[in-house]
Design a protein with these regions (language model features):
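Acidic (Asp/Glu-rich) sequence patches and key acidic residues
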Residues: 1-148, 152-162
Length: 164
C-alpha cells in the first residue's frame, strides 16, 4: 500500500552569534506561542574534521550550530538560540495547503517579524520538511504570492527531504 507523502513546515527565528535573545518578546510581538524555543545550548556531538583548522567560531560547517575553536579536533559545538512555530506533519500531495496555513498564521505580521529580526539580530527561516518515498514526492511549487510573502518576511526558504 502506497503511503501519502507528508509535509511539515517550520518557521524559525534564530540568533546565530552564540548569545540568547528575548524569546518571550517574540511571542508577545507575534501573538503566537512557539512550538519550540531554546537558548543557546552546547551541542551533544563534536565535529571531528571540517577540512580546515578552526581558530574562530564557525557557523558555516554545521547548520543550526556554531563550531567552537579548539586546539585540535574534535571541535565542540553550540546550538543557536531559536524560536519556532511548526505545523504538524500533514498528509498531502502538494505544498500549497500547509503553506497557506502557515502564511495565514503570520499574515499581517510581516513588519513585526522584520522589526524583531532587526532588533535582536535574528535570521528568519522557513523549512519545508518532506517525508516520502523517493518515487512518490509531493508537488513542491512556491506560487508567486508565497514567494512574495516569504520575501516580505525576510525569510530564507529551504527544503529537507526524508526519503524512504
Amino acid at each position: 500500500m502506497k503511503q501519502t507523502p507528508q509535509i511539515r513546515l517550520v518557521f524559525t527565528l534564530t540568533k546565530r552569534d552564540g548569545t540568547d535573545f528575548e524569546r518571550d518578546a517574540v511571542t508577545r510581538g507575534l501573538g503566537i506561542s512557539p512550538t519550540r524555543s531554546c537558548p543557546p545550548t552546547p551541542g551533544k556531538g563534536k565535529v571531528q574534521h571540517s577540512g580546515k583548522e578552526i581558530r574562530e567560531p564557525d557557523e558555516q560547517v554545521l547548520p543550526g550550530f556554531t563550531v567552537l575553536p579548539a586546539e585540535a579536533p574534535p571541535y565542540p559545538t553550540l546550538r543557536h538560540a531559536y524560536w519556532s512555530a511548526e505545523l504538524p506533519k500533514m498528509d498531502c500531495r502538494a505544498l500549497d495547503e500547509p503553506l497557506q496555513q502557515l502564511e495565514q498564521m503570520l499574515c499581517g505580521k510581516e513588519a513585526e517579524v522584520r522589526r524583531l529580526c532587526e532588533e535582536y539580530s535574528l535570521y528568519a527561516d522557513l523549512t519545508v520538511r518532506v517525508f516520502a518515498a523517493s518515487n512518490d514526492l509531493p508537488e513542491l511549487v512556491l506560487p508567486d504570492g508565497s514567494v512574495a510573502f516569504w520575501a516580505s518576511v525576510g525569510a530564507t526558504v529551504s527544503f529537507d527531504f526524508y526519503l524512504d
